[in-house]
């Protein structure tokens, strides 16, 4: 009978004090989560972590410049004065080509580590359980584009530039469906579009 008639917030017995303490801890956890969510929202538009990437670019470019200078100074020892200009320019070009991908890859990795929070934040907006047909429409549009560009690349005659494009585009729609059932997919997508629009109207009001 104590449980039914007791005000557990004001009661001093062991059981009620434990319940009150647990409620306080849960409220503190909820407050912490809200604060973290607000900090993440502010962190999206916060410009503080961004300048670290340009600094890396500058450092990497400086390193690349010094290595080019080293190559220029070492190349005249191996060749004559007439061949120095010919030997230094290709080494410069090669060093720059080698340095540029490493710069972009490093900057990309650091920027993605900053953007991991953003992806989780944006994923909370999109709920695929409410609109199960919405994802199919996006897949269908990508598949349609891939088929169009695939046919255009095959018209090129299988050139060197067209073949990697073909392979990359073919791997993209392969996860969604096979190319044989294209007409069936088209029928399904039109039906799902109607169903999605009616469902979307129901939810929007």
From Swiss-Prot:
One of its GO terms (molecular function) is metal ion binding. InterPro entries: DM_DNA-bd (IPR001275), DM_DNA-bd_sf (IPR036407), DMRT (IPR026607), DMRT1-like (IPR022114). Keywords: Developmental protein, Differentiation, DNA-binding, Metal-binding, Nucleus, Sexual differentiation, Transcription, Transcription regulation, Zinc. The keyword DNA-binding applies. One of its GO terms (biological process) is sex differentiation. Residues 180-205 are annotated as: Disordered. SUPFAM superfamilies: Cysteine-rich DNA binding domain, (DM domain). The keyword Transcription applies. GO terms for cellular component: nucleus. It comes from the Eukaryota. It holds the Pfam family DM. It is found in: Nucleus. PROSITE patterns: DM_2. Residues 1-29 bind DNA. May be required for testis development. Belongs to the DMRT family. This is Doublesex- and mab-3-related transcription factor 1. It comes from Trachemys scripta (Red-eared slider turtle).
